[in-house]
From Swiss-Prot:
Keywords: Cell wall biogenesis/degradation, Glycoprotein, Glycosyltransferase, Golgi apparatus, Membrane, Signal-anchor, Transferase, Transmembrane, Transmembrane helix
Protein task: May be involved in cell wall biosynthesis.
GO BP: any one term: cell wall organization
Domain of life from the UniProt record: Eukaryota
Signal sequence coordinates: none
Protein name, per record: Probable glycosyltransferase At5g25310
């Protein structure tokens, strides 16, 4: 019995040993499989140390300074990016989405170039009924369709109203606030909340509100520049997109006269980014190959003046005056106009200050031509008001890049007069035949919709043509 128990004990001990070894191997295999799966599932693309050392901008003094991230703070930077940047995605997914954007741009370019040589007007006749006012209506139509199909804008969410995500929707700078509002209301199909699907990135600060809330009388633009510089530093720290292109696929939008000055807060914003501005003065750094002219549209209570609204009586209004102007004497051009024509000719009433008993818009509706001289700045709502009143705009300006010149032929609905020719202004206008005048006026009626702000926006209106101008800059394509 003792001998049998001894054999059984040895057999049991050996069995336990083999069983333990098998169990350990099984657990090891399962654990390895689990961790392999875990690493595959949670594999992230962290920023390289060299990437974190890229230059960023700060502006504690209101000017641009370059700061290099110290290696001791690399870990902290990674943690910050991981915890605050919702745009961090797995590396393959990032690459695929960015590739899709670039592939979309390439396909759009090819499609537009193919359409540019197409002379078949039936394709776009219903949307662009008057082909004469466009540089290349076929290319414009195809480009617009490609924009509707592909174009996506990412709006940075950093910042608080009213300086960011808000803007004026009334008065002379209304177009600035209306654009910001349309992008922020989430009504437009062009906004995306996935930055990796975006074609461009919008910096939604309002220069008009910066001037209103930060500017102090008899000072300078330093507080505005400081804010803009700090804002760009914030978004470039929270997201990788600004540093990826030095801001080339980013845009700001403003109608305030200080827009160009404020954009100097950051070198890349001024030189590389798309600046959408009413004050499009080429002598002040406006570059039409990358920047966009924003039409200056004055709104009263959110609408244009009732006398400028489209109506049958507007088109039938008699036009007893050859030309008209009323405005203050400032800037280099207006003094020349007033010197030669102020109260000189009854056919061309020119006032420095319009008498109170007379109505400005009544004069516009009663004149064949409306003089649009630049003031301190090149832009003026007078150009758009002339279009609304069907009064042929006479552009008297130096270095002013007119709105939507990439698609519109301004010579088909306005008269461009060199400043040196102002003394001959009446002679020039009198030389325009009645047939040509009626042609110009007819074209004004067709082009009007491109300068209207609608609520909600309508196809081919000012909001959408502004987006289209940005789209063209992203395509790096010129429609001719």
């Amino acid at each position: 019995m003792d001998k049998f128990q001894s054999k059984f004990t040895r057999f049991g001990f050996i069995s336990i040993c083999f069983g333990s070894i098998a169990l350990v191997l099984l657990i090891s295999h399962c654990s390895t499989s689990f961790f392999d799966y875990s690493f595959q599932k949670f594999k992230f693309s962290f920023p390289e140390e060299t990437e974190l050392r890229r230059n960023v901008y700060t502006s504690s003094s209101g000017e641009e300074n370059r700061v290099v991230v110290d290696s001791r703070h690399v870990s902290q930077q990674i943690l910050t990016v991981r915890s605050t940047n919702s745009t961090l995605q797995s590396k393959p997914e990032k690459l695929n989405r960015r590739n899709l954007v670039e592939q979309g741009l390439a396909k759009a370019r090819a499609s537009i170039l193919e359409a540019s040589s197409n002379v078949n007007t039936t394709l776009f006749k219903s949307d662009l009924p008057n082909s004469e006012i466009y540089r290349n209506p076929s290319a414009l139509y195809r480009s617009y369709l490609e924009m509707e199909k592909r174009f996506k804008v990412y709006v940075y969410e950093e910042g608080e109203p009213p300086l960011v995500h808000d803007g004026p929707c009334k008065s002379v700078y209304a177009v600035e606030g209306r654009f910001i509002t349309e992008m922020e209301k989430r009504r437009t199909k062009f906004r995306t909340y996935d930055p990796n699907q975006a074609y461009v990135y919008f910096l939604p600060f309002s220069v008009t509100w910066l001037v209103r809330y930060l500017y102090e009388g008899n000072s300078d633009a330093k507080p505005l520049k400081t804010f803009v510089s700090d804002y760009i530093r914030l978004v470039s720290t929270n997201h990788p997109f600004w540093n990826r292109t030095n801001g080339a696929d980013h845009f700001m939008l403003t109608c305030h006269d200080w827009g160009p000055l404020t954009s100097q807060a950051n070198r890349d914003l001024f030189n590389t980014s798309i600046r959408v501005m009413c004050n499009a003065n080429s002598s002040e750094g406006f570059n039409p190959t990358k920047d966009v002219t924003l039409p200056e549209i004055k709104l009263y209570g959110g609408e244009v003046d009732h006398k400028l609204r489209l109506s049958k009586t507007l088109s039938a209004s008699p036009r007893p005056y050859l030309g008209f102007f009323a405005g203050g004497v400032h800037g280099p051009v207006r003094p020349i106009l007033l010197k030669h024509w102020k109260q000189r000719d009854l056919d061309m009433p020119v006032y420095e200050y319009l008498p109170k008993h007379l109505n400005y818009y009544d004069f516009m509706r009663s004149s064949k031509f409306c003089f649009c001289p630049s003031g301190y700045e090149v832009a003026s709502p007078r150009v758009i008001e002339a279009i609304y009143s069907e009064c042929i705009p006479v552009i008297l300006s130096v270095n002013f890049v007119l709105p939507f010149t990439d698609v519109l032929r301004w010579e088909t609905f306005s008269v461009l007069v060199d400043v040196s020719e102002i003394p001959r202004l009446k002679e020039i206008l009198m030389s325009i035949s009645n047939e040509k005048y009626e042609w110009l006026k007819s074209n004004l009626r067709y082009v009007r919709r491109h300068f209207e702000l609608n609520d909600p926006p309508q196809r081919f209106d000012a909001f959408h043509l502004t987006l289209h101008s940005i789209w063209l800059r992203r395509l790096n394509l010129k429609l001719t």
